[in-house]
Every structure is written in C-alpha cells, then in structure tokens.
Amino acid sequence: MAVNKNGIVVLGAVFVDIKGFPEDIYVPDGRNAGHVEYIHGGVSRNVVEDIANLELRPTFLGIADNTALGEDVVRKLQRHKVNTEYMKEIPNGMGTWLAVFDHNGDLAGSISQRPNLMPILDILEENGDEIIENCDSIVAEIDIDRKSVV
C-alpha cells in the first residue's frame, strides 16, 4: 500500500478517442449516418486509472484541455480517487485520436493530434521537489518529449 501523500506518481498524456461507427455500409467518400463515442484515453491516463482501481491512490501529472471535455476527464480521475492537484488545464492540452470504423468494425481511417506535454515541465519546475519527496515511485510515459524528462 502507498505510504506517501502522492503514492505512485504517473507522468504523461491525456488523450480523448473520438470513434465513429456507421449504421450501414461505410461509404468512404460519402455521408455516413451512425453514432460517435468519446472515450477517455492516453496510456498514462489509463495507467493512473488502473492504479487507482487497485486502491493505491496515485497522483497524475498531466495536462487536460480547459474545456468541458477536459473537466470531465479530470472529474472522472477524481471519482477514481486519483490525486489531480498537480494537473494543468490549458487550451489544446489533450491529445485526440479521431477514428472512423467501417460497417465490419474495422478501422477505415484515423487522425491523431498529439498533445504538447511541455507544460508538464512547468509543473515539475514549480512543484517537482514536493511531488518527488512525497511519492512512493514514479511512472513516466516513454513517448514524451526528451526536454520534459532531462
């Protein structure tokens, strides 16, 4: 069990996956009626939620959008008992994966908007000593800009 205030600190990205599914046969160059799902994602966000589900009370160092969708991501993490006090909410703070699936459920196309993780460096410069001295361990996303971790 975690003994320090910040428990396991997870550092990395938040993504929101936007997935579209057609009601009928998918027409790539036409209009397709269907339904769209918004799913909170990102490897680090997923990992911190999984750690919280084990009741280890982790801390997340990440960036969310300063939008209703970003607020929803933070609220969901808080409901899972993730410490979000060091998260920042900024414009375009989250990554987005837009995916369209065909009528068989296979991926027909996608676009990924990568988040700017440099503001995590600001969090570490402002609160890094406090975060690290009050944690049990740190999990860092590997796909992070080198400047954020050096």
Description of each model-found segment:
Residues M1-I63, A68-D72, R79, W97:
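Glycine-rich phosphate/adenosyl-contacting loop at the front of the ribokinase-like
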Residues A2-V14, K76-E89, F101-V150:
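Ribokinase/PfkB-type carbohydrate-kinase core domain
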Residues L61-N66, T84-M94:
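Beta-strand->loop->alpha-helix junctions that form or flank phosphate-binding loops
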Residues G70, G95, R146-S148:
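Short, well-ordered alpha-helical microsegments
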